[in-house]
Amino acid sequence: MMVEGAWNLGVSGAGVAVTILDDGIEKDHPDLIRNYDPLSSTDVNDNDSDPNPRYDFSDSNRHGTRCAGQVAATPNNTLCIVGIAFNAQIGGIRMLDGQVWTSSHKTERNKKVFASSIL
């Protein structure tokens, strides 16, 4: 994605919180745990604060974790990738794979920017 230029200017996501609205994120994933933000996370399907995906026999609910890694994966940890905004706080709202609703979350969580793309 050619982000090195932004990184060279000191842009790293510091001071920004990003929330992924998807099938959940693995909050304890080694690439995400350092930047995990519980205040930007919830599970609307089970009505609790744990954004971890529901894994079944197909093991298919990993999309949110992958998206979160592309945004805020920790650099230099001997794992796979570095996130584009590697110093951003990352949260997840587990809303897919169950009941879907989004409109009240912007107000409830006092977020200035709210975007949701669900295909």
Question: What residue spans do the PLM features occupy?
Answer:
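Active-site core segment of subtilase-fold serine proteases
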Residues: 1-119
